[in-house]
């Protein structure tokens, strides 16, 4: 008697085998689709993407780098290394298309490093699976059209990990330089440094001798930080090498109106983040004010602050519309807004009211298909974790990736959650998702 479950399993294996075996064609189509989106379906920047662009454009027009004199009285400084890259791009050609073409290059480089990391850790077959997993994760395609720092930041992280895995002092130093550059984009880069240090300390105690690898990595990191910080000091007067968003993120996750995610009510009059005359305070003074407000609240409401941790995790991992809406051309509507609207209004016709039925269908299909894929990746990752715990299969390489995700998640729990914050975590775990699929489903098949 034929077992239906075996038939389904065999069918799934055949489908996966067919997809992976055509990886070159899929990669070519992926590049073509990106080019088509960039030139024929450019996206209007909103939210942080628009804010980053305005910062870069103001500096470009005044022939300055970021931060500039006019940024002294901002609430905080964001992604200084990334903003300066955008300024240079605008000097080449002042258009958002220039940024998208840069993102296309970043995306392909990131894909290359994920492919090579997987190849180094496992084999060519698994590397091809990781390539397909990466391509099918549509947020990356959407990020190419936008101006967020996540794509560039993650490239710096994965390239640092790649060179860290090589046996060369020069490449260890390069790994450190890239690590320093990632910190220049987002403070979350510190999570990777801590991961490297934990692994190094383990080796020192295990082998009872000094390990030179972390020393060269730290030297490379400090080289970048000193170089970039000095560059900013000479044109801005302050040694700035990373974003100063830590205090405001801490406050967003530690106040009476905190929800676990971004909630602008904290800035309303009478609330913890309200500043009567913000234009009179420098970013340093504002940061000190936010940090004082947050830490005072945490001291008084420690249990409540700890209780917000699950909500921060939910806001980060519970849904995954980082850039999916942009692919449907509906950036004003995302999955969060849609759920809130349906909860309150419960009228499907009021969602995307100015769009055609075709756009509405495309929007919902993309959201549903992508979220099924996203949660499938999470399930496979959990299965990989369980399997490795049971069989004690963790290697130094896998632990670096895991520690980066764990420490990065702790940083989120301390501050505030956002679906964008997990993007690097998903990308760095793709090699291990691919390895689990290869070992459990495709081992008996030859992928040529």
What is each model feature region?
Residues 80-87, 92-109, 143, 364-371:
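Loop-to-helix entry region of an early transmembrane alpha helix in multi-pass inner-membrane enzymes
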Residues 241-344:
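Membrane-proximal stem/loop segments at transmembrane-domain junctions that anchor or position
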Residues 47-50, 77, 98-106, 129-159, ...:
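Multi-pass, polyprenyl lipid-linked donor-dependent membrane glycosyltransferases
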Residues 87, 130-131, 163, 172-187, ...:
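Membrane-interface alpha helices of multi-pass inner-membrane proteins
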Residues 50-75, 81, 256-270:
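Extracytosolic helix-loop segments that constitute the early lumenal/periplasmic catalytic or substrate-binding loops
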Residues 122, 158-174, 201-206, 437-440, ...:
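Membrane-interface transmembrane helices that cradle and orient dolichyl/undecaprenyl
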């Amino acid at each position: 008697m034929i077992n239906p479950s075996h038939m389904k399993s065999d069918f799934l294996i055949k489908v996966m085998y067919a997809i992976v075996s055509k990886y070159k064609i899929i990669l070519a189509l992926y590049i073509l689709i990106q080019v088509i989106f960039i030139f024929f379906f450019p996206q209007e920047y909103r939210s942080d993407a628009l804010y980053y662009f305005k910062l870069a454009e103001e500096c470009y027009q005044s022939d300055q780098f970021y931060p500039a004199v006019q940024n002294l009285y901002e609430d905080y400084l964001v992604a200084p290394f990334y903003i300066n890259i955008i300024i240079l791009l605008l000097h080449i050609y002042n258009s958002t298309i220039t940024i998208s073409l840069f993102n296309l290059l970043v995306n392909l480089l990131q894909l290359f490093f994920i492919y090579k990391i997987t190849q180094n850790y496992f084999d060519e077959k698994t590397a091809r699976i990781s390539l397909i997993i990466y391509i099918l994760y549509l947020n990356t395609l959407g990020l190419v059209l936008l101006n967020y720092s996540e794509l560039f930041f993650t490239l710096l992280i994965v390239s640092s990990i790649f060179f860290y895995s090589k046996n060369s002092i020069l490449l260890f130093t390069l790994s450190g330089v890239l690590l320093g550059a990632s910190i220049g984009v987002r403070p979350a880069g510190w999570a990777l440094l801590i991961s490297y240090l934990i692994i190094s300390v383990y080796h020192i105690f295990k082998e009872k001798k000094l390990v030179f690898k972390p020393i060269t990595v730290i030297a490379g990191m400090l080289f970048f930080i000193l170089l970039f910080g000095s560059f900013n000091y000479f044109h801005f007067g302050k040694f700035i090498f990373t974003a100063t968003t830590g205090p405001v993120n801490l406050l967003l996750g530690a106040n009476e109106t905190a929800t676990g995610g971004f909630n602008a009510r904290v800035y309303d009059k009478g609330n913890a983040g309200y500043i009567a005359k913000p234009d009179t305070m420098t970013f340093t003074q504002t940061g000190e004010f936010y940090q004082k407000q947050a830490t005072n609240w945490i001291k008084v409401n420690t249990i409540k602050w700890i209780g917000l941790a699950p909500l921060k995790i939910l806001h980060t991992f519970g849904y995954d519309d980082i850039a999916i809406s942009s692919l449907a051309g509906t950036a004003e509507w995302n999955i969060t807004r849609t759920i809130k609207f349906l909860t309150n209004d419960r009228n499907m016709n009021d969602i995307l009211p100015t769009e055609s039925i075709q756009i509405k269908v495309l929007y919902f299909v993309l959201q549903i298909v992508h979220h099924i894929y996203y949660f499938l990746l999470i399930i496979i990752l959990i299965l990989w974790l369980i399997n490795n715990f049971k069989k004690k299969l963790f290697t130094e390489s896998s632990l670096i990736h895991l520690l980066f995700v764990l420490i990065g998640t702790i940083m989120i729990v301390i501050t505030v959650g956002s679906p964008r914050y997990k993007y690097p975590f998903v990308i760095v775990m793709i090699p291990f998702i691919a390895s689990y699929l290869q070992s459990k489903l495709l081992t008996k098949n030859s992928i040529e």
